[in-house]
Structure formats: C-alpha cells, structure tokens
C-alpha cells in the first residue's frame, strides 16, 4: 500500500492512500498563517499520515512517497523559502515515520512519465487523469477573495498526490527502494 504525498507548497499539502489501482482515501491539508504556525501545520500533516498508517496497519512493506525537492524547475531557480518549507515537511515526515514505514522520494518528471505517459505533463493533465479514472474525487475548489471575484479552480495538489500513490503501485519495489530516504 502507498501513501502518496504532494507537498504542494507551504499552504497546501495533499495525501492519498492507494492500494494497487484502488484509491482508498485522500485529504487536503491547508495552511492559514493567520490561524496557525508552520509547525502546527506540519503537525496536522503528521497526524493525518499517522491516522492512515494506523487505519490500514501499514508497515515497512508499505511506502510513503513524496516528490523530491527540486533546486530548479524548468531551468529556473526555485525560491529558497519554498525549498526550505518543503524540506522541513520532508524532514518532519522522515523523523516521525522512518521506524514505521518505508519512505521514498520520486522526481516529479519520473512519476508523471509513469502515470501520465509524459514527464513534462502539466498540472491540468493530472487533474484530467484523476477526473477520468476516479470520478468520485471532487477536485473543484472555490476560492473567495475580499477584493476580487470568486475563483473556481481545480485541486491539482490532490490530483498529484493520487498520481504519486499510483506511481508507487506501478513500479517495481526495487525502484522505490533505490530512492529510500529513511534514516534507519
């Protein structure tokens, strides 16, 4: 079984639980700097992952998979603040769960190539894939603004988290083990 995590950015993180091609659960955890600290946000992520591990009795034979933090995205330097935010979340996950479950990282282009058939696929492609194959997942998001019109968006973070979970079930365990990041 795979827990797929899209670290998104500091304000949004999505988690999926996938067994083979079966999507068992998914969640989206939002961060609001007005009501919580980044540490409290990381604790919410850990709490959700722990709940999934306990509910499905996951062990070292199962995996958490998250995206590798990239220093460059499409030839452009990533912002240091973004890199640090993602690295803190990864470090927290590794610290909390290394003794419990296998933890592997995957390059964004790698999972996109395996799941979507194109390593350079865009967010819209993962959304379209999930809407086609998992119509029970509502990816519609309404964002209300004080000074602008309401926006109607798609939750590409949840789509990516599900695709990452699917990736873990589509590749050989040896491939996942090559990219383990557990400290134990």
Which role does the model predict for each range below?
Residues 1-184:
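Phosphate- and other anionic-substrate recognition elements at nucleic-acid/protein interfaces
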